[in-house]
Structure formats: C-alpha cells, structure tokens
Amino acid sequence: MDLLIVGLGNPGSNFFHTRHNVGFELVDNLVIKNGLSLKKVKNYEYSDFNFENKRIVLIKPLTYMNLSGNIFPSVFAKFYMKIANLLVVVDNVDLPLGKCKLRKVGGTSTHNGLRSISLSLGSTNYGRLYIGVGSNNESSLREFVLAKFRGSELERIKSVFEFLSEEILGIDESNFEHKVATINSSSF
C-alpha cells in the first residue's frame, strides 16, 4: 500500500519546536533519516520516494494549520493518491506528552487542522497518527499549542520522532493492526 503522510503544523521558524508542529517535525525527521530533501510546490512541501517496494509521499502543508485541507485537491491529483493512502500526523492535547495513538478513522475533536481536512475531503475516514503533547490548565489552548517544548519535554518528543520514524514507513494493510498495537502501547 502506497502511503501519503501529511504532517500538520504552521510554516515559519517561529513555530519550530512548538506543540502544534509535531507533524511537521516528524516529516522533517523522516526526510533527514532517509537522506531526502523537500521540494516546494505552491502551498506545500513534499518528498516522494520508494521504501520497501512501496511509494511514500511526505507532505508539509504551508497553509497554516487551520487551512490544511486546502492542499488536498492538488496533492491527490499530483501524486495519484486516494483517501485510503492518507495518514495525517497531528498533535493531541488529550494524550500525555510522548504518548502516541494510531487510528484508521476518527473525528476532528477540537483540532482545526483535522476539521479543515475532513471538510475538504468530505470524509473523516482517513488514517491519523496522534502525538500527545500534554495539556496545561495555566493558559488557553491556543497559547499552549503554540508554546515551545521545554528542556526535557523536547528530548522526550525527539525520542518519539525517532521511534515513529522506524515504525510508520512500514505501515500497510496487512500489518496495520500490529502497528496500532506497537505504536499505541509505546510511551516516552
């Protein structure tokens, strides 16, 4: 099964290492780990390569989080992919820091990036990889997700990226449930 991995985040160096940008940073980690580079097209960056006899396309939307869905008509047309190939990597404030959750389908909850994608696709039937960024009652949700990780938090998230970089490229229909068990039982 070919895989279209879309990491959500906000473009610009001021968002680097923020909780909302874990999707971007996982894509960056995959690019570096596999000796790739990102190419820019209109409103997204991508890398297209083969891994274990399947096509992998990595995407970083450059539309800002709340408009992430805007890229999908051109992405699906350019790469000849379908919703069945899609895995969206996104932050989740309902999961503890470092906890991950892989799902085949799901809702949008309070996540505007997922809401934008679901509206654009007309469906919520696409894969999601949630990365727990913790929660905080001291600030608003917006302030919290746009805040940078601190010291030991950043080290934990980097460990998550290393682990996920080993796990997600191998996802396919035959091992999806095994990958769910492996990823969902991990914690950093």
Curated annotation (Swiss-Prot):
One of its GO terms (cellular component) is cytoplasm. This is Peptidyl-tRNA hydrolase. Pfam families: Pept_tRNA_hydro (PF01195). It is an enzyme of class 3 (hydrolase). The gene is pth. Belongs to the PTH family. The record marks 91 as: Stabilizes the basic form of H active site to accept a proton. It is found in: Cytoplasm. Its EC number is 3.1.1.29. It comes from Borrelia hermsii (strain HS1 / DAH). The active site is at 20 (proton acceptor). It catalyses: an N-acyl-L-alpha-aminoacyl-tRNA + H2O = an N-acyl-L-amino acid + a tRNA + H(+). PANTHER family: PEPTIDYL-TRNA HYDROLASE. GO terms for molecular function: peptidyl-tRNA hydrolase activity; tRNA binding.
